A protein has these predicted regions:
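Zinc-dependent metallopeptidase catalytic helix centered on the HExxH motif
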Residues: 227, 231-264
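Short intrinsically disordered, low-complexity coil segments enriched in acidic
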Residues: 1-8, 301
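Active-site recognition of the HExxH zinc-binding catalytic motif
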Residues: 26-33, 128, 207, 212-235, ...
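General secondary-structure edge motif
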Residues: 8, 108, 208, 238-241
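Active-site-proximal, well-structured secondary-structure segments within enzyme catalytic domains
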Residues: 19, 23-24, 28-204, 254, ...
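Substrate/cofactor-recognition hotspot
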Residues: 5-8, 12, 20
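Short, histidine-centered active-site or binding-site loop motifs used for metal coordination
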Residues: 3, 205-207
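Alpha-helix N-cap/helix-initiation motif
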Residues: 10, 14, 113, 117, ...
Length: 301
């Protein structure tokens, strides 16, 4: 609520800029022969047309609305127990999280001991090897921009070179927040020759301390799996022109490889590849895996 007050008033109010932007977009689309900006934009999207987008949204509504309505009522019931009769948007996240803890008795901190960052990275590589037959070998003789950066050579099963893969996972004062995939060289033509890519993922994961190694939350593990999906898309690209390589593809496709990779994290077989207690080396218990899966399905309507 406080954030909204700052955004919608005073020197930070950008409503006028947004209105001008949407007007100019509409005018541009009309000049180019389209009915509206959406129709113009969708010429370079898989959806292809506003009619297809609307059909897709209608199908989603039919499937999700009953579940969403039921889930929202559960959140409202919990809020009423605290005397909140009219649940507002700014209260929704708080009561949703409270309900999640009540239903699943699930605390992210329970999982940290099983997600040592080195084990997570090894697990990601195992998944990639099982699914795509590719191998990751750490190399030390490549220049890097910071001592924390690790570099891996990615090869096909037959030894053919696919990519160099740089990982830079922990926060520094000079680093932007968040996590992302990028490349130092895309796959495609470079100086007249089709080159393999130089791919990187960058993050700001929980760092190690004097007492403990880097132990991640489940959300952080999910983030790295997601970004690695983008990285895989880049590593496995095989095109002549880099404008067609990952991530320079249709924007309503670009998140698919990352979502697929992220999805594997919810599978028991995946977690058993790498989720081991950093002190005892015991596998993550089935009970915790079931809690993870149940919590992932929570409030998905």
């Amino acid at each position: 609520k406080a954030r909204s007050k700052v955004s919608f008033g005073g020197k930070y109010d950008n409503q006028g800029i947004i209105k001008k932007t949407t007007t100019l977009r509409y005018e541009k689309a009309r000049i180019l022969g389209f009915k509206e900006h959406a129709e113009y934009t969708l010429q370079k999207r898989m959806a292809g047309s506003t009619a297809n987008v609307n059909k897709f949204l209608e199908r989603l509504y039919e499937v999700y609305y009953p579940a969403a309505k039921k889930e929202l009522e559960e959140v409202r019931d919990l809020a009423r127990k605290d005397g909140v009769e009219d649940l507002q948007a700014w209260d929704s996240a708080y009561y949703s999280e409270k309900l999640k803890k009540q239903k699943f008795d699930f605390d992210q901190e329970e999982l940290r001991p099983y997600f040592k960052v080195e084990n997570v990275i090894d697990g990601i590589y195992k998944v990639a090897e099982l699914l795509y037959g590719i191998k990751f070998t750490e190399i030390k003789d490549v220049p890097v921009y910071h001592e924390e950066v690790r570099v891996f050579e990615v090869t096909e099963k037959n030894g053919d070179f696919l990519s160099l893969f740089y990982i830079d996972l922990h926060p520094r004062e000079t680093k932007n927040g968040g996590a992302w995939m990028t490349y130092f060289r895309p796959q495609g033509l470079c100086d007249g020759k089709v080159e393999r890519p130089l791919i990187s993922i960058v993050g700001n994961l929980t760092p190690s301390t004097e007492e403990k190694p880097s132990l991640l939350t489940f959300d952080e593990v999910e983030t790295i799996f997601h970004e690695f999906g983008h990285a895989l898309h880049g590593m496995l690209s095989s095109v002549t022109y880099s404008s067609l390589a990952s991530p320079d593809v249709y924007w309503d496709f670009v998140e698919l490889p990352s979502q697929i990779m992220e999805n594997w994290l919810g599978e028991k077989e995946t977690l058993q590849l790498f989720a081991k207690h950093y002190e005892t080396q015991e596998d993550i218990p089935d009970e915790l895996i079931e809690k993870i899966k149940a919590s992932q399905a929570f409030n998905k309507g």
